[in-house]
Amino acid sequence: MHGKNACGRSQLIFPMVTALAFMCTQASAQYRAKDTEWPSYGADLAGTHYRPLDQINASNFSDLEIAWRIKTDNFGNRPEYKLEGTPLMVKNVLYATAGSRRAVIALDAATGELLWVHGEHEGARGGAAPRQLSGRGLAYWSDGKEERIFYVTPGYRLISLNAKTGMPVASFGTGGALDLKLDDDQTIFPDLTTGEIGIQSAPVVAKDTVIVGAAFREGMTPKSMKNNKGYVRGFDVRTGKRLWIFHTIPKKDEFGYDTWLKDSSEYTGNTGVWTQITVDEQLGLVYLPVESPTSDYYGGHRPGNNLFGESLVCVDLKTGERKWHFQLVHHPLWDMDISSAPILADIVVDGKRVKAVAQPTKQGFLYVFDRVTGKPVWPIEERKVEVGSVPGEWYSPTQPFPTKPPAYSRNGVSVDDLIDFNPELREKAKAVVSKYHLGPVFTPPVASKADGPLGTLTLGTASGGTNWPGGSYDPETHIVYAYACNACVEPIGLVPAPKEVSDLRYIAGVDGREVGIMRGPGENAGADSPMPPKKAPGGGFVRLNVDDLPLIKPPYGTITAINLDEGKIVWQIAHGETPDVVRNYPAFKGMNIARTGQQTYNIGTLITKTLVIAGEGQVTTTADHPRGAILRAYDKATGKEVGAVYMPAPQSGSPMTYLVNGKQYIVVAVSGGPYSGEYIAYTLPSAGE
């Protein structure tokens, strides 16, 4: 074990050569080298999740077998049950984050053999981190001579590693590490150890700049209206020198400062970029999907439209200077932060070539812009929306609505959206929702009252539509593929905040119920964290169902194909086996219920030459397979299912693919429930097997 310092450790398991054995076969010769690798989180800097490989296709997908697998349990002092990573593959080596310590591992991409591992022991700083566990990925850089791997630790330190050995690059930062809580144009409070700021997504490397965003606690109960700010920075890839910073909450004399009334920009925080960033290196432009400001559901302490909250912002790659922006939600109140990477797409609209950027959203809207100018490709209309009545709140009277493409998932709730398998269940559902305020997208939260309404019932908010895995794009057909949760219904009620919980006037809750801190699923789960409490009160979450059945009618989860040349939906299918609770419901015996899809939000898609590939987010037990989940393949032209293979647990990280030694592999992260994290690589049987 080679020691970097008291914090970092790298171990070279086997000496690595500059290139592993390469077999020149007919299968590998037909692809360009860049098409056989996966060098970025989203396959490329455009965020396409696309590779034109077709060795695995409709005729053989169901024949896939496990080539190798690696559990992440030992990359930390406890297992993790939320493995969300998508690996990289460059020069026959697969790189991934793993385990509750967020270690970096390098594997032989063909065999899964461990080549090296690097981990950071961050002590109290890692234990207090707002985004823990293994995170979602890494970044790779090479100038043709040197090769480096970049990642951000739970404690918010940017690490540069030698890609061949896993050793820290001494010339970067201080001994290979850059403290991201410093040189951030703010003083992180209350201190550098416990100050709330971090990130779980992969950094992005474009040309010689590494770009890092910021994230905060996942829970829906802010302790204060004040928080650290989520600025975005670019650093020199060789030295770690800060090259630029973009203030997602503008400072005085900066554009957008006047959208924060009563000096609220001075103390409001969050407003980071916690998901993936995309880059057009040719244009020298970076696309930043910005989250909500402090307090997802109550904005009375931050009156105004609150730029650049919930905005897509384009900045210069060299300077970080804002080129254009579009705010998708004015004065955010619904946790509709832009949760996934913008997709860069070269399309043809009305005979004219357009360099576009397409932004999937939780609302199920796909916003499409000219990525050079920021002009919408199709009109986006400002429409009047309901204005609420929560004391002290500030409301925007209008919100932006795209005219094309149409919404690809439900947003807003009406009686027509309720479960409709039979009249009895529909009546029970109507009784449940009678206690809530219903309305279309952008219906505001309400002050919760025990005698009603308890809250506003929403679809297309925190867990709706497309979440962090994002969409995929086929650059040959100009079609976007997006998974969406079509039934992730969430009530938003507000109650006065107890002083011991928060200094906000209102926080998420239900009148008459105990109110407490609502924690995110990864909090206090990292290797340096104390064990989490067994039970914590959560006043804002109420599970809504009817006889344990989903309150909303199917389809629960969908994959949609959207033609970007025309702004039209090509096809939409239910994705995921019908849940056991539905299939085994006594009153449904003998009924022919079409596949419903699944009520989950964290599914990413992989696009190949002919297929759309996605796993399920829930486990089921059927006559066809034991308890587990299924990795499914669809004909990307029609949406017809053409193959399926078994997974022992739900897909929890987006799948990726590559070609090594003439063989195509698909790697997917699985975890959840009692099943700890595991990367599984699938490939076709070798000839003669």
Label each residue range with its predicted role.
Residues A67, E113-V117, M167-A170, D179, ...:
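A structural motif specific to WD40 beta-propellers
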Residues I70-T86, V117-G144, T174-A202, E218, ...:
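Extracytoplasmic beta-rich repeat domains
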Residues I13-T25:
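Bacterial N-terminal signal peptides
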Residues L161, G166, N228-K241, N305-E321, ...:
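Beta-propeller blade signature
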Residues W38-G42, E80-G99, A103, A129-R157, ...:
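Repeat-blade elements of multi-bladed beta-propeller folds
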Residues G47-G144, I149-T174, L178-K181:
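N-terminal cofactor/phosphate-binding cores enriched in small/glycine residues
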Residues A29-Q55, S396-K430, P521-A527:
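N-terminal pre-domain segments of enzymes
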Residues A341-V390, S671, A681-S686:
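Phosphate/diphosphate-binding loops
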